[in-house]
Amino acid sequence: MAQYLAPHELDPYAKGKVKDGKLTAPMFDVVFIQALSTEPIDAKSIPTWKKYLKSEVAEVKAAGSEPVVVVTWAKKDHPEDTKKLADSIISAANENGAAALPVGLAFAEAHAGRPDINFYAPDKRHPSAAGSYLYGAVAYSFLFHRSPEGLKFLGGCDKPLSEADAAYLQSVAWKTVRAFYGW
């Protein structure tokens, strides 16, 4: 993680809080940690991923923040990986005393209910505007422990989502987070 924080040493908001690429004082309430794509289920990558996840979670905690591990989504042409990714990431988050953010589970739920919405960029692994919106709605639900339903923001991309699509994604995000955490 240190390699990612090093450039922030020059940012005004980080003055005195980042040194040698490491957090030295509480700077954020929550820090999201996200693996690369299918790293948590790739046999060759799992040991390295777990090693660095452990150190990143420890570093975030040491800096006074809450680590949250993002449950990533399956690639568009491999929906069967959703459960494998969720199981691997949730298990690793639990092992390290971190919370998990069920974004991938929300992707699967949203796609099942509305296959007409494209959740993926052309590379079939990164999120589209709708996928990014859903991610944000899941994060909102988790962070504020309340529903994003009724929020008027339709996305900041070139073409905003329709009100109906945004309402659907808000609903799925809240339903997923509530079910995941038993709220």
Predicted regions located by residue number:
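Active-site segments of SGNH/GDSL-like serine hydrolases
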Residues: 60-87, 103-114
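Conserved catalytic region of serine esterases and O-acyltransferases that act on ester linkages
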Residues: 126, 137-183
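Second-shell loop/turn segments in exported
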Residues: 37-46, 72-79, 118-127
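Conserved SGNH/GDSL esterase-like catalytic core that processes O-acyl groups on lipids
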Residues: 1-49
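Charged helix-capping and loop-helix junction motifs
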Residues: 47-53, 82-86
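Structural recognition of the beta-strand scaffold that forms the well-ordered cores
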Residues: 1-3, 29-34, 66-71, 99-102
